[in-house]
């Protein structure tokens, strides 16, 4: 052990001696400083030793490798948006109201101007519907006559029950205020004439019935007389036959008495037959007497029903004509501003369903109506975010609008340039573009491009998709 320690100490001392001697001559061992051109005249191996290779290529290589690694990591982790681009235009939402006439009319008065603010119910235009006023007056006149006819038949109906003519008194209604005295007299005359005609017919039937009853009384009296005569002649005939049996009188006297009895019996049968006939005639006369009243009553009730139906139809017709006149005064359906005013000439003619102006509500918003190509429609859903770029204002300077997909048409439409496309509506959050402190209002009809965000994908997937597509297609055999 002692020997090992001694050897180790000598070893350390030896290294110390060598290091100290070397340290003393360290400057002598340094390579002499030479200029660059001096190194070029040295032997090749010495030149290589004196001028080592620069580290710049190595650093550049390290930098490129690091950049590639970072780019690969970012391409795997980073993602980009998948958007479907659709061209379209700005449109007003369905809350904007188009003002149209219901029929051909003449412009009577223009109340509003372009851009003017209006409140709900304000008058916008006054039109004159062709023939509306004349139709209203005609219907009012016909309706008044129908109501007067109704009163006439109501009075006649009551007169049948009372058997006398009630006093004519018009109801206290607004539409009877303008009835003239001549019209009242004419109506009274018609009522009296019809009532008198019915009374005369009834009187004639009553006279006929009384006549038949008088004839019946006469026949009854004769029947009573011949019943007595027949009874007396029958008694005498029995007496004569008794005397003939006793041979107290001649047979000729019995035959003569028998002839008298037969004549009396025949007369009695004739008058009884006449009584049956007169009874039948009296019954028929009674029916005719009642029929006169019943026919008159049925006629009055039928006329009353027809008049009531006519009043209902004329009332509906009058309401329609009044609605036509009311519709000729066009009012604002909502509060907002007048836009796209197309009527400027009083006395001009407007046609049915022609748009006269548009009332844009105060809180109305814009929408984008865009055409999405068939290849993109499968990835678009309601609620997806979208960016709207207005063609008239470059988005790099004025920005863009933000919106969401509101509705997707489920049926394709044919476009001459794009083929089969789908109509998509995108709601817009703002109605103007902002640049600094300036707001630029947008209007309906401006061309826009809608970029609808349909999803996300990694950058590496985006870069490799062309290669993947090429490889996939190249491995197929035709």
Swiss-Prot record:
Coiled-coil region(s): none
Keyword Ion transport recorded: no
Origin: domain of life: Bacteria
GO cellular component assignments: plasma membrane
PROSITE patterns: HLYD_FAMILY
Listed transmembrane segments: 60-80
Gene Ontology terms: biological process: killing of cells of another organism; protein secretion by the type I secretion system
Topology Periplasmic: residue spans: 81-478
Record's keyword annotation contains Kinase: no
Topology, Cytoplasmic side: 1-59
Cited function: Involved in the transport of hemolysin A.
Family: Belongs to the membrane fusion protein (MFP) (TC 8.A.1) family.
Name recorded for this polypeptide: Hemolysin secretion protein D, chromosomal
Chain's gene name: hlyD
């Amino acid at each position: 052990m002692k020997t090992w320690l001694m050897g180790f100490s000598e070893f350390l001392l030896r290294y110390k001696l060598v290091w100290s001697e070397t340290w003393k001559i360290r400057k002598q061992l340094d390579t002499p400083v030479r200029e660059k051109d001096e190194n070029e005249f040295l032997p090749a191996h010495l030149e290589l030793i004196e001028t080592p290779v620069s580290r710049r290529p190595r650093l550049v290589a390290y930098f490129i490798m690091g950049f590639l690694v970072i780019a690969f990591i970012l391409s795997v982790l980073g993602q980009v948006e998948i958007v479907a681009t659709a061209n379209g235009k700005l449109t007003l939402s369905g809350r904007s109201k188009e003002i149209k006439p219901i029929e051909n009319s003449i412009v009577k008065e223009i109340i509003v101007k372009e851009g003017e603010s209006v409140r709900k119910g304000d008058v916008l235009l006054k039109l004159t519907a062709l023939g509306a006023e004349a139709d209203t007056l005609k219907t009012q006149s016909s309706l008044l006559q129908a109501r007067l006819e109704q009163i006439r038949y109501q009075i006649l109906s009551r007169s049948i029950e009372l058997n006398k003519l009630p006093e004519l008194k018009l109801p206290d209604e607004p539409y009877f205020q303008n009835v003239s005295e001549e019209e009242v007299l004419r109506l009274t005359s018609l009522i009296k004439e019809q009532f008198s005609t019915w009374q005369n017919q009834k009187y004639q039937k009553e006279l006929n019935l009384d006549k038949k009853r008088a004839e019946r009384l006469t026949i009854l009296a004769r029947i009573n007389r011949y019943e007595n005569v027949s009874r007396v002649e029958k008694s005498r005939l029995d007496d004569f036959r008794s005397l003939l049996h006793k041979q107290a009188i001649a047979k000729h006297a019995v035959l003569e008495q028998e002839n008298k009895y037969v004549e009396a019996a025949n007369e009695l049968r004739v008058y009884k037959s006449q009584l049956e006939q007169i009874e039948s005639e009296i019954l028929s006369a009674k029916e005719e007497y009642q029929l006169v009243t019943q026919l008159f009553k049925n006629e009055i009730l039928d006329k009353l029903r027809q008049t009531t139906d006519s009043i209902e139809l004329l009332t509906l017709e009058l309401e329609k004509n009044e609605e036509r006149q009311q519709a000729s005064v066009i009012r604002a359906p909502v509060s907002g501003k007048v836009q796209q005013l197309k009527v400027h000439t009083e006395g001009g003619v407007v046609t049915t369903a022609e748009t006269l102006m548009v009332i844009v509500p105060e809180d109305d918003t814009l929408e984008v109506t865009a055409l999405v190509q068939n290849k993109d429609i499968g990835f678009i859903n309601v609620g997806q975010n979208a960016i709207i770029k207005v063609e008239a204002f470059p988005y790099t300077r004025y920005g863009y609008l933000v919106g969401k997909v509101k509705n997707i048409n489920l049926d394709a439409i044919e476009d001459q340039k794009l083929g089969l496309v789908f109509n998509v509506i995108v709601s817009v959050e703002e109605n103007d573009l902002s640049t600094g402190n300036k707001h630029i209002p947008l209007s309906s009809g401006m061309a826009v491009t809608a970029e609808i965000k349909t999803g996300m994908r990694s950058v590496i997937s985006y870069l490799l998709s062309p290669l993947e597509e090429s490889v996939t297609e190249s491995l197929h055999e035709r």
